[in-house]
């Protein structure tokens, strides 16, 4: 069957997500929407360099074009002051954008053009309104910092905003950021309008301009609380203070749960807040309390003069009981359709009462390790943010009710003190209590839960598709696999494995010839979450970031967008997108907050479920990550997140639980670090007890790439696959070669370190996942095809496969036939026998003048090795060299040519004796 991916609809849907995710914090002096008949002045170099996403694996999507905000304004008919624009263009050319030093080394911001006050005054004579754009980035292995140019405004930005404010009648500030930033100087300078336009992917400028010009009224809501200072956040005292450990002393009181309970005065903008060009009247028309649910009918009327959408948010105030609760907790939300002035819509929201229960990790209610609906009054509030939501209804719970009876799992092994509310004359103060520690023997628990071994039969000719078609059982299929086969199937191969789509993150499943012989296909994973990362240079669609998607509060639009994403994946033979990222915004300095949704687990889970449902419509899926408590990038491979079991279950695991139970998640990635002393890659409680036994997860799990694994009390080891597999974490990502690897699986099988039945269970999980993939359909010869229409010719990719070259210690590639025309790329891949630091020598010539600057940039696995800038050589061959680490067997390279006039001769790779 052929399916259609309409690229124009894809672009339009992404731009719509941008416009619905933008959050307008203020709009004084009727600064917005813009009058397109009047000229505007645009300040800030980010007008040319829109941040489509943050950095690292979540942002490395190759695109043909990013629509920046300036493009969007001009395309929407806005008149932009040409003199100011030309001045910026000239300065930007003389002061190139700083790409930084590659992976984890990109600057958080760029230097700004110093403003001549005379120019500002001159442009202000013809322009009533100025737009100032400030940009930020951060990402993988790069947290934000509490310093100028990162979380704080830089001196240049303060000076720019100040002089513009002094000279313009109306000032609009756009924050092109992946994460909230400090608002102190912004509040002091007081622009008329302030909008978080986030990072909107390749269509970000279009969606932003649609809002600025009034084509779309802003309807985004804050997925995080904006406090006055970074130190106001409850996690601040325990974020990054220790090299290898963060203690989650704030417990369940994360974000608005803390502020609304203990510190309302520290909030600048509350969770869920966001303005529109119009106004809405919200009334709870009906509240029905049943045994299992609270059903609310809420009328929303547009009483303003612009069309627009509104988000209805429902919060619950539970009785404090013996456990202690947050003052308000989000328990439902819906977004209206677009309402014209005076139009009204009734929104129906149902709240599952059982999901209002709190987890008792201490036994204080008499129900240890249970979710308990404590006795007392449960009040519900309805509105458009957590602070302004008004009382709607309540019900009385007569006695404690256990809604779910579980067992202690993943509890800390060391006690610490956590926050607990103390009620004093109608207000709460912060008390403390000791956190319960684990009483579980993890090794004994694992042995108690060993599956039954399947007797080995050898090859009976059963193929995996025979299981799919009901001809044989999965047990009969798994019985054929030898010990060696079982050791291979738990290896992911990559990055850039030739078994799957070029430039992707990994192959899994059929990673050996023997496994292929059983009809096990090689499934394909690609980073993720903001679109496909294809390191061979293939162009893909860059999506709005997770924070922007959460800000839309629009589940239906999210599913629609990710159906397009799924079709694009299918067209590129990708089975798993490594996303959505689901970690909680515990602190605003976390560098990967842009990938994640929110400080709230309910919103996180609902939006992730919407993404998964969308991808499922195309026969593909996402890998929910990072499981769990991955809330800091600094020293992420060794960090220990020390968290109470209650906080884990109610905050840091809850979003994952919703994604599994409501979104049908079938692929999960663990973290690099530890939770309560044990690396998550080998944590049995996490991967088996909670994920599979409690939540009913049916699918496969994987480690993060080159993750550490350990046994309680022992040092981490990247080769301890036995510890990973017996935890029921199924695949180690990644190995250079699926058929041979320096791991301990077979040795552990011989000495009793792992049981054969456990490896069979891993194999069944992996094969069970592959049963439902396009990869298996292709192996059967019945795969669907996806036809892409309305994609411009220059965006189409060459179908020629990437060529692999085997390398022992050195190789020289003749590149004299490569097209070096400006804007083109050339990709190739190396199959390495030896890993280490390689010297890269590029030889080229040019007949241009000696002053000519002809740059070409070399990328390794999507990360810049460096730019080789040649001058005119009089036609003589000249060599330039750099060094790059290569520690993956399959390494994909891409050369990008930024200027005409270079005659490329060769590229040589030589292994050096340098250590990493």
Task: Identify the residue ranges that each predicted region occupies.
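Short beta-strand elements
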Residues: 388-407
């Amino acid at each position: 069957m052929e399916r259609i991916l309409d690229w124009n609809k894809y672009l339009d849907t992404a731009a719509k997500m941008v416009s619905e995710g933008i959050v307008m914090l203020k709009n004084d002096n009727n600064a917005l929407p813009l009058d397109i008949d009047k000229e505007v002045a645009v300040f800030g170099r980010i007008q040319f360099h829109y941040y489509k996403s943050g950095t690292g694996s979540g942002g490395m999507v190759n695109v043909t074009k990013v629509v920046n905000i300036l493009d969007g304004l001009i395309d929407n008919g806005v008149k932009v002051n040409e003199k100011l624009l030309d001045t910026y263009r000239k300065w930007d050319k003389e002061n190139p954008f700083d790409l930084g030093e590659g992976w984890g080394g990109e600057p958080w911001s760029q230097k700004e053009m110093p403003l001549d006050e005379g120019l500002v005054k001159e442009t202000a004579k013809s322009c009533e309104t100025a737009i100032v754009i400030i940009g930020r980035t951060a990402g993988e292995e790069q947290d934000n910092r509490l310093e100028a140019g990162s979380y704080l405004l830089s001196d240049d930005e303060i000076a720019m905003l100040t002089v513009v404010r002094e000279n313009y009648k109306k000032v609009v500030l756009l924050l092109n950021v992946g994460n909230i930033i400090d608002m102190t100087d912004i509040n002091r300078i007081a622009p008329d309008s302030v909008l978080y336009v986030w990072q909107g992917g390749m269509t970000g400028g279009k969606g932003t301009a649609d809002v600025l010009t009034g084509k779309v009224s802003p309807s985004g809501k804050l997925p995080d609380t904006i406090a006055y200072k970074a130190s106001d956040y409850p996690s601040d005292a325990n974020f990054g203070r220790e090299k290898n450990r963060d203690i989650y002393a704030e417990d369940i009181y994360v974000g608005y749960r803390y502020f609304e309970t203990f510190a309302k005065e520290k909030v600048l903008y509350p969770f869920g807040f966001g303005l529109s060009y119009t106004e809405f009247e919200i009334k709870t028309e009906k509240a029905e309390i049943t045994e299992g649910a609270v059903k609310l009918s809420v009328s929303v009327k547009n009483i303003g003069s612009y069309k627009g959408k509104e988000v209805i948010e429902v919060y619950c105030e539970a009785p404090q009981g013996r456990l202690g609760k947050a003052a308000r907790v989000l328990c439902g939300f819906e977004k209206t359709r677009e309402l014209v002035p005076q139009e009204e819509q009734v929104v129906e929201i149902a709240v599952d009462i059982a999901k209002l229960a709190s987890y008792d990790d201490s036994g204080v209610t008499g129900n240890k390790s249970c979710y308990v609906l404590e006795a007392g009054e449960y009040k519900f509030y309805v509105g458009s943010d957590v602070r302004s939501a008004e009382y709607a209804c309540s019900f009385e719970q007569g006695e404690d009710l256990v809604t779910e009876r579980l067992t202690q799992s993943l509890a800390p092994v060391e006690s610490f003190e956590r926050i607990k509310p103390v009620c004093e004359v109608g207000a709460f103060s912060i008390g403390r209590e000791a956190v319960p520690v684990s009483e579980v023997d993890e090794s004994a628990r694992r042995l108690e839960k060993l599956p039954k071994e399947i007797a080995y039969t050898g090859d009976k000719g059963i193929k995996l598709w025979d299981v799919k078609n009901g001809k044989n059982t999965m047990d009969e299929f798994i019985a054929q696999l030898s010990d060696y086969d079982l050791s291979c199937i738990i290896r992911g191969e990559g990055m850039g494995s030739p078994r799957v789509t070029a430039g992707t993150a990994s192959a899994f499943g059929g990673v050996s010839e023997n496994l292929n012989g059983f009809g096990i296909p090689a499934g394909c994973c690609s980073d993720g979450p903001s679109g496909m990362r294809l390191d061979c240079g293939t162009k893909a669609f860059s999506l709005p970031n997770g924070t922007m998607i959460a800000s839309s509060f629009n589940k239906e639009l999210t599913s629609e967008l990710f159906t397009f994403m799924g079709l694009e994946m299918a067209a590129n033979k990708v089975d798993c997108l490594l996303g959505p990222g689901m970690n909680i915004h515990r602190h605003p300095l976390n560098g990967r907050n842009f990938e994640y949704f929110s400080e709230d687990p309910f919103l996180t889970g609902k939006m992730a479920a919407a993404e998964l449902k969308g991808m499922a419509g195309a026969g593909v899926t996402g890998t929910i990550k990072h499981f769990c408590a991955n809330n800091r990038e600094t020293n992420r491979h060794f960090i220990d997140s020390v968290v109470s079991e209650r906080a884990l279950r109610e905050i840091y695991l809850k979003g994952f639980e919703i994604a599994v139970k409501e979104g049908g998640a079938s692929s999960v990635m663990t973290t690099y670090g530890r939770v309560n002393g044990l690396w998550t890659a080998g944590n049995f409680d996490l991967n088996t007890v909670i994920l599979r036994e409690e939540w009913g997860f049916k699918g496969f799990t994987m480690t993060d790439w080159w993750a550490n694994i350990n046994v309680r009390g022992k040092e981490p080891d990247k080769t301890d696959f036995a510890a990973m597999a017996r935890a029921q974490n199924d695949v180690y990502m990644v190995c250079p070669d699926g058929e041979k690897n320096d791991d301990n699986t077979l040795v552990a099988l011989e000495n009793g370190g792992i049981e054969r039945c456990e490896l069979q269970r891993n194999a069944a999980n992996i094969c069970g996942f592959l049963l439902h993939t396009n990869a298996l359909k292709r192996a059967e010869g019945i795969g669907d095809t996806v036809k892409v229409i309305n994609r411009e010719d220059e965006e189409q990719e060459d179908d020629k496969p990437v060529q692999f070259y085997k390398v022992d210690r050195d190789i020289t590639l003749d590149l004299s036939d490569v097209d070096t025309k400006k804007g083109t790329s050339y990709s190739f891949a190396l199959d390495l026998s030896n890993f280490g630091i390689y010297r890269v020598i590029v030889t080229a010539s040019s007949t241009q003048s000696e002053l000519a600057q002809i740059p070409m940039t070399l990328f390794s696995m999507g990360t810049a090795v460096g730019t080789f800038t040649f001058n005119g050589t009089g036609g003589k061959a000249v060599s330039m060299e750099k060094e790059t680490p290569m520690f993956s067997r399959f390494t994909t390279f891409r050369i990008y040519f930024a200027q005409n006039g270079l005659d490329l001769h060769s590229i040589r790779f030589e292994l050096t004796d340098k250590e990493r």
